[in-house]
Amino acid sequence: MQLRPFGHQVRGPAGQGAVQHRAGGDVDLGGSAYSAGLEAPIKHSHDFRCWPGYGESVPAPRREDSSPVSPYIPLPAGLAEPRSSAAAVFDRIAGLYDQARPGYPPEAVTDLVRICGVGSSSRVLEIGCGTGQLTRDLAPNGARIVCVEVGSSLADAARANLGRWPNVEVVTTRFEDLDVPTSSFDLVVSATAFHWVDPEVSYAKAAALLDEQGKLALLTNAHSRGGTHIDERIAEPIRDLHRRLAPEVGDWDFPTAEDIQHRAQAGGDIASVWARVERRLSDPPPLEQLFGQPTVKTYPWLATYDRNAYLAMLSSQSSYALMDQVRHDELLASIGTLIDEKLAGTVTKEYVTVMAIAARAPG
């Protein structure tokens, strides 16, 4: 791949359902293609105010805290391999993904920029940009950003969202297949996407593409046990629904913010940290020769959803989007009814954003 000259304007096709993000985190759909299956506007807000311990390694405090959405889109036959299936389903729900997926706390982005020294002369590679959830916060710093996204619809949405920044380029390809010279970047970053890359390739290739002072940064929004989404009025009925309709999704049990922070801060190289954070069962590859010890930071925060936005957020996750339509729609309709009847149509959900940053090892 030849990297295009800096300053070339990247634009997606006009009128392809771009999403306008307003102050406070609300979203407004700009095209009917992005609201297919949604019978009411999706609105949500993210409370990124700093809880005690926000951005640090201390425990976070305990807190008390219309019609069903059916964005189901059938998948093509023959997708048996999990990575391929997930990539395909995200691409087929690109509009829903764009409007429903949360971004990242401003403090996390500020720390990322500060620790990695991101500025106008920086060269950044983002792996799995989605529709630009993190990119839109990095782009104003002026760094040259090459975004890799395997899904063509996701990439088109990212181009539409990021077209105002001439320093951003979106490339439709797998990271494994990206062909660029070694030592091309100062920062390789991936937000809630690195686990979809082949682990035999991910860390080694990221290290090879970094220059001598370069850094790898990984972020994710971990689901935690805080907010009314685990309120006793709805939690057990939702668990019963999952046991009956979606046993493959899980049992509606979430770790506490303290548990997530403890796993993140338990030491080891960046691959070990990330395997614990994402609760992966397989052993990560040893990275002694690739990266130094990571800096790890955590950011607990709270999101507030109306019922449609909450159901859309669930549907944007691969485990729900891969369900067959009948079970998917029954599950979401039942959860929506519980939210309406028990929580007056509004639900809060706690996340813990985890960020791990490691410098490329010398040599």
Please describe what each predicted stretch is.
Residues 212-300:
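Conserved catalytic/acceptor-binding region of the Class I
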Residues 59-119:
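Conserved class I S-adenosyl-L-methionine
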Residues 267-363:
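Conserved Class I S-adenosyl-L-methionine
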Residues 201-212:
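A short glycine-rich, Lys/Arg-flanked "PGG" loop and its adjoining helix->strand segment in the class I
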Residues 123, 131-177:
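Class I SAM-dependent methyltransferase SAM/SAH-binding core
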Residues 127:
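Conserved beta-strand/loop positions that form the S-adenosyl-L-methionine
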Residues 177-187:
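A short acidic, Gly/Pro-enriched loop at the edge of an enzyme's catalytic core
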Residues 186-200:
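A short SAM/SAH-binding and catalytic strip from SAM-dependent methyltransferases
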